[in-house]
UniProtKB/Swiss-Prot annotation:
Organism from which the protein derives: Bordetella pertussis (strain Tohama I / ATCC BAA-589 / NCTC 13251)
Top-level taxon of origin: Bacteria
Region ranges (Domain I): 1-64
Family membership: Belongs to the RuvA family.
Keyword terms, alphabetized: Cytoplasm, DNA damage, DNA recombination, DNA repair, DNA-binding
Gene designation: ruvA
GO CC term (a single one): Holliday junction helicase complex
GO biological process: DNA recombination; DNA repair
Protein's name according to its UniProt entry: Holliday junction branch migration complex subunit RuvA
Pfam families associated with the record: HHH_5 (PF14520), RuvA_C (PF07499), RuvA_N (PF01330)
InterPro entries: DNA_helicase_Holl-junc_RuvA_I, Hlx-hairpin-Hlx_DNA-bd_motif, NA-bd_OB-fold, RuvA, RuvA_2-like, RuvA_C, RuvA_C_sf
GO molecular function: ATP binding; four-way junction DNA binding; four-way junction helicase activity
């Protein structure tokens, strides 16, 4: 498998870019977010890649970060989501925004992506739940390490993500971990 490509960017033709590596030009499908982040043609670039070999084609998908590639790989495992739809999702939402949408179960945010209907969005939320948040830490309250620790403790105690997030919202700013867990449990028991 081709995991990463470094070379000279010779062409941008959305959603495909062409990267020259020692005289060989690789056509790589990229999400629009990656395309916009790339420098002008002629510059040296590195893309994290995912290779798909089918009977009739070999397709190379490229991403600006390994987190974006990992998210793509998780997305294509979801029933009804192919590589093109996964690229559309990553074009419309950053990895952090997708993780937040999954954590907060926001079907409306996902249905704004072309190719994602209500049922597909619900399936995506169901199958992706718990697969991104821990890796990326993109929950709305993850800015503080303490809140992340409190959230993980509540989840480990068996509370749902929704309940845990609601309890976190009620905590005062700057609370330490042990006090935060105590206050969150108190809020959850009510």
């Amino acid at each position: 498998m081709i995991g990463r490509i470094t070379g000279t960017l010779i062409e941008k033709s959305p959603p495909v870019v062409c990267v020259d590596v020692n005289g060989v030009g690789y056509e790589i499908d990229v999400p629009m977010s990656t395309l916009y982040a790339l420098p002008e043609t002629g510059a040296r670039v590195t893309l994290f890649t995912h290779l798909v070999v089918r009977e009739d084609a070999q397709l190379l998908y490229g991403f600006g970060s390994s987190a974006e590639r990992s998210t793509f790989r998780e997305l294509i495992k979801v029933t009804g989501i192919g590589a093109r739809t996964a690229l559309a999702v990553l074009s419309g939402l950053s990895v952090a925004e997708l993780s937040q949408a999954i954590t907060l179960q926001e079907t409306g945010r996902l249905t704004r992506v072309p190719g994602i209907g209500k049922k597909t969005a619900e399936r995506l939320l169901l199958e992706m739940r718990g697969k991104l948040g821990a890796d990326i830490g993109a929950t709305p309250h993850a800015a503080s390490g303490h809140q992340s620790d409190i959230l993980n403790a509540l989840l480990a105690l068996g509370y749902s993500d929704k309940e845990s997030q609601a309890a976190l919202k009620k905590l005062p700013d700057g609370v330490d971990v042990s006090e935060g867990i105590r206050l969150a449990l108190k809020a959850l028991v009510r």
